[in-house]
């Protein structure tokens, strides 16, 4: 069974892909199968992915004041996907915020630029106090 970390990696990848080209249900299924995310974890990944997309405008409203000049164009697509997922989890899940931020930092180390972990930590830590 896939770990929660692997599920988060897959969700970030789907969010990133969706920024470039809207993700189809077929692509989503094939991608999750390729990553060996199945059964309950697959349902969890699909549900979270859909909910992040459904709440994208609300999440971006919360993120905007914490970005330099409120400018999303200066944030890489991978980093933005990690921020959206982290913020979604902080706002809508029961998981401890410190755990969510730590997980987002780990995702940034694996998937983002060299400066991404520090950036992700700074933004989510500031937002944590507002939620």
UniProtKB/Swiss-Prot annotation:
Coiled coil: none annotated. Keywords: RNA-binding, Transcription, Transcription antitermination, Transcription regulation. GO terms for cellular component: cytosol. The keyword Glycoprotein does not apply. The keyword Protease does not apply. InterPro entries: NusB-like_sf, NusB_fam, NusB_RsmB_TIM44. SUPFAM superfamilies: NusB-like. One of its GO terms (biological process) is DNA-templated transcription termination. Pfam families: NusB. Transmembrane segments: none annotated. One of its GO terms (molecular function) is RNA binding. Involved in transcription antitermination. Required for transcription of ribosomal RNA (rRNA) genes. Binds specifically to the boxA antiterminator sequence of the ribosomal RNA (rrn) operons. Belongs to the NusB family. This is Transcription antitermination protein NusB. The lineage of its organism: Bacteria, Pseudomonadati, Campylobacterota, Epsilonproteobacteria, Campylobacterales. The gene is nusB.
């Amino acid at each position: 069974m896939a770990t929660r970390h692997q599920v988060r990696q897959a969700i970030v990848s789907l969010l990133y892909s969706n920024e470039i080209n809207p993700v189809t249900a077929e692509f989503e299924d094939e991608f999750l199968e390729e990553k060996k995310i199945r059964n309950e974890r697959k349902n969890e990944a699909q549900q979270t992915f859909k909910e992040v997309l459904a709440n994208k405008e609300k999440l971006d409203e919360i993120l905007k004041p914490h970005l330099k000049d409120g400018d999303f164009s200066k944030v890489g697509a991978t980093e933005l996907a990690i921020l959206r997922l982290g913020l979604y989890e902080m706002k809508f899940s029961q998981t401890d915020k410190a755990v969510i931020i730590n997980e987002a930092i780990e995702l940034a180390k694996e998937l983002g630029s060299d400066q991404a972990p520090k950036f992700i930590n700074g933004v989510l830590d500031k937002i944590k106090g507002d939620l």
